[in-house]
Amino acid sequence: MTSIFQLTLFALILFSFVLVVGVPVVFALPNGWTENKRIVLSGLGLWILLVFVVGILNSFVV
């Protein structure tokens, strides 16, 4: 269970870094938001899901 938690936490950290870099790039493009709105919102949804999964797995590890 600990390894699953660690992999999920690593995925959350990696995906957070991708969003921190990617979202400002999307907003900086001339038509970035209108063209990539679905990708940004999907990424946000996946990030929220990862936060909840890490929280649930944390209760089993500790």
UniProtKB/Swiss-Prot annotation:
Membrane topology: Multi-pass membrane protein
Keywords: Chloroplast, Membrane, Photosynthesis, Photosystem II, Plastid, Reaction center, Thylakoid, Transmembrane, Transmembrane helix
Secretion signal span: none
A GO BP entry: photosynthesis
One Pfam short name: Ycf9
Task performed by this protein: May control the interaction of photosystem II (PSII) cores with the light-harvesting antenna, regulates electron flow through the 2 photosystem reaction centers. PSII is a light-driven water plastoquinone oxidoreductase, using light energy to abstract electrons from H(2)O, generating a proton gradient subsequently used for ATP formation.
Family matches, as PANTHER family: PHOTOSYSTEM II REACTION CENTER PROTEIN Z
Protein's UniProt name: Photosystem II reaction center protein Z
Lineage: Eukaryota, Viridiplantae, Chlorophyta, core chlorophytes, Chlorophyceae
Gene giving rise to this polypeptide: psbZ
